[in-house]
A protein has these predicted regions:
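Residues that act as N-cap/strand-start positions at coil-to-secondary-structure junctions
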Residues: 2-3, 227
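Catalytic cores of enzymes that engage adenine nucleotides and/or redox cofactors via long glycine-rich
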Residues: 224-227, 277
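Active/ligand-binding-proximal structured segments within catalytic/core domains
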Residues: 14, 21-72, 183, 254-266, ...
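Charge-rich, well-structured scaffold segments of protease-associated domains
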Residues: 4-5, 10, 21, 65-223, ...
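Extreme N-terminal starter segment of soluble prokaryotic enzymes
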Residues: 4, 15-16
Length: 415
């Protein structure tokens, strides 16, 4: 039995506080989660969620940008943030004795950022350089091209970073209006894991966030529909980078755990079928693997890799062959058992890291409004059967519905 001391409190203004007390460690990981991501953006302000994440590090009435970093780092801690398609997270890790200053700094950033026009102009240049750097990395951009092609015209298909045009056009008024709409108490989750009590966390959250206000915001639900299209981007690179896949499952669909097992067998690790066949046995690629991602209303499954233009067709053929093999239910009992053990082990091992515990709770609160017990997840993984795998593989791996995205020195009709 895995014992987790998780408690949840909702403040009077709607801010949710979740904590896990782990008395045998000396650290604490704190995350401020906001239930807003790139999927919530309109076309004219694409990239604004990510841009706001940058701006919240640029100073408050009582702290400069440098002071924000120094107050955490001078105590041996670390401070960072990330933007996803459905949420944004500002987080820090430090010794548990510094939990008060960590909460003070993070909440000050969230609630009192200056959004100085000069800083906005300067940070635009930073993000524009980030976009250029990103475009120079085809092994990364191919994933966005894949999502855009798979989910054409759906906000989940948009790149998180935005475009050079939309980022250049952002104004302080855009940012303030967006934050007033989305950075509301009902969308905020304070997630804390480490050597700290729930009462301490609630007191700090009340002190620093208890007075913020704003009307609740309800995201418009719209399930993404797969296009079945493919796309080639011609570029003078040494390799062809590709993603082949399609629709996965939402966060609330238990078939996501069936797909997790399939993913592990196909390309989730070094002992997977694709890694062994394409890299180890044939030496056709350095990077080859697969992934499954779940969102509120849908999900993605994809095989990704990079190979020379001359061997791209062969790698693609081997990949589709393995997908078809899984459709024909040729996974062995041993493969399924090992995959279940691997997935369960990775989940349990993640509990040794306070940041992983904090992130698991934060994501669960954003998606479900509660923390799904780890025992429940482990039971769902154990319950996956060969019939489940056969059913899901037949549903997802139909070659006529798959989407392929590729970047490299290819002709337009290469796929």
């Amino acid at each position: 039995m895995i014992v987790q001391n998780i408690e949840i409190t909702t403040l009077s203004n709607g801010v949710r506080v979740v904590s896990e007390t782990v008395p045998y460690v000396q650290s604490v990981s704190v995350g401020l989660w906001v239930g807003v991501g790139s999927r919530d953006e309109t076309d004219p302000v694409r990239g604004i969620t990510h841009f706001i994440e940058h701006m919240l590090f640029k100073g408050t009435p009582t702290r400069s940008a440098r002071t924000i970093a120094e107050e955490i780092e001078s105590r041996g801690g670390m401070l960072n943030a990330f933007t996803d398609k459905e949420y944004t997270c500002y987080y820090a890790k430090a010794l548990s004795e510094h939990v008060e200053i960590v909460m003070d700094v993070l909440t000050d950033m969230l609630a009192h950022s200056l959004l100085d026009p000069e800083e906005i102009a300067r940070e635009k240049n930073v993000v524009l350089e980030e976009i250029k750097r990103y475009k120079d990395q085809p092994e990364d951009t191919v994933h966005d091209i894949f999502a855009q092609t798979l989910w054409k015209n759906h906000p989940l298909g948009r790149p998180i970073i935005g475009t050079s045009h939309t980022v250049s056009s952002l104004t302080r008024e855009h940012i303030e209006e967006y934050m007033q709409t989305h950075y509301t108490p009902d969308k905020i989750v304070v997630s804390v894991a480490g050597n700290v009590t729930h009462a301490e966390v609630v007191e700090l959250a009340n002190r620093f966030l208890g007075s913020i206000s704003g009307p609740p915001y309800k995201r418009r639900a719209r399930k993404p529909q797969p296009s079945g299209n493919s796309k080639t981007v011609r570029r003078r690179t040494e390799q062809v980078h590709f993603c082949l896949g399609g629709q996965g499952f939402s966060q609330k669909d238990d078939d996501r755990w069936v797909l997790t097992i399939i993913d592990s067998v196909l390309g989730g690790n070094m002992s997977s079928r694709l890694f062994q066949e394409i890299r180890e046995k044939r030496g056709l690629a350095y990077a080859i693997g697969s992934y499954a991602v779940s969102y509120t209303e849908g999900g993605i499954f994809a095989v990704h890799g990079g190979t020379s233009p001359q061997t791209f067709s062969q790698v693609l053929e081997l990949t589709t062959k393995e997908l078809e093999n899984v459709r024909k239910n040729n996974l062995t009992e041993d493969e399924v058992m090992k995959s279940k053990t691997q997935v369960r082990g990775a989940l349990v091992l993640s509990l040794e890291n306070m940041s992983s515990r904090m992130m698991r709770m934060g994501r669960s609160m954003i998606h479900f409004g509660r923390v799904i017990p780890l025992e429940d997840i482990l039971q769902k993984i154990n319950a996956v059967t060969h019939d489940d795998i056969d059913r899901v593989a037949n549903q997802l791996f139909d070659g006529s519905t798959l989407t392929l995205a590729a970047i490299g020195p290819l002709e337009k009709d290469a796929i």
